[in-house]
């Protein structure tokens, strides 16, 4: 097994896409290659075919490599909650909620064991592992607590390439600072530097690059330009703020940017629909001039409901529900309830709270363990939102709580999964303009999505498109190959050929 590792001078330097790019290129050349990130902190997660939970970033990287996602590609997933606490997912399964200091001081041994096991597991099926670090390897205040950078490089004897983000400014200082803050023993592992997200004429960088190479004796092997045409899933809400959605189209679908928004990749397929613009709306924004509103997932339904009330969005949503479709996904679906019952305060200190009351149902927490699984079913009946009876849908569930329906119709008859409650019979609910589901990825179903957007087109006096081709599905592979080509055309690929020969 050969290990190649990308570490960054900072968070959001481009490590995730750099790993995806190299995985894509190596896969296209016939190598058996897998991505790996020992520890990831993210609110965007995914359920695998084995019903394991992992970061969406490693899912994206595995798709770029053309392989099935596996939780061993991301053995430790930290999902931030409140007050310096995260839910810790180990090899796809919840290990509990832990405070940061408790995790670092008391869980480290178990975490390292899981990382070693996952690396060993991947050896069976792959020849090359492309590893992504986390944040910066030069966090000297907690260097001895590292679980994602040089510890993993030592564990795998990996060659390290440092990725630096020039778009943030100060790229040369960040390269030199990172390099010299790393202890000499680990510094020797750094074999090259890539400058990422460059805009303009690369010739202006030559004097700086020459000085960097003189100071570090490390070659700069590539300058990757900033490419705004790439359309790939975002890993976290920080990246979401810079994501370029299509706006100013004939139809505007608002997506409510909840304070604790999660799994916002659910909306990605809508961005590929002709005539459709996606507008991220704050809870403080005016919600007028929208043609539909999506309330996405959240890592804390109760706390975000409280924020909706404080901001005034609570009443705004109730008002516009009489005029436009409102679609809730997972936590957003739970918010549509009359009440959310949380007697044990498992979600927050507020306990039970009033919901938006747009669907006659009640959501209860503390009744079941977290649901993590892939799901499928069929739409139960035709609706004014465009959905048609017997349309097949798939998705994945990542939720706590059950939802008990009152005088309201379920949306989906379940073939596989849990849905609203332990019976596993039905998921979601629909009444007039308002609809919701526990299925993440619901809009990744082309027929379901197209029926919904065609109804929006009809509502606006536009011609429906019908079931033509799925631009989202086709564009994913195109985008992954475009990412790989961008890397290959701007990086010295002979460097990697030499690494693989060693």
Curated annotation (Swiss-Prot):
Keyword field contains Repeat: no
Family annotation (Gene3D superfamilies): 3.40.50.880, P-loop containing nucleotide triphosphate hydrolases
Active site as annotated: 330, 440
Pfam family name, one: GATase_3
PANTHER family in the cross-refs: COBYRIC ACID SYNTHASE (PTHR21343:SF1), DETHIOBIOTIN SYNTHETASE (PTHR21343)
Function: Catalyzes amidations at positions B, D, E, and G on adenosylcobyrinic A,C-diamide. NH(2) groups are provided by glutamine, and one molecule of ATP is hydrogenolyzed for each amidation.
Protein name per the record: Probable cobyric acid synthase
Organism: Methanosphaera stadtmanae (strain ATCC 43021 / DSM 3091 / JCM 11832 / MCB-3)
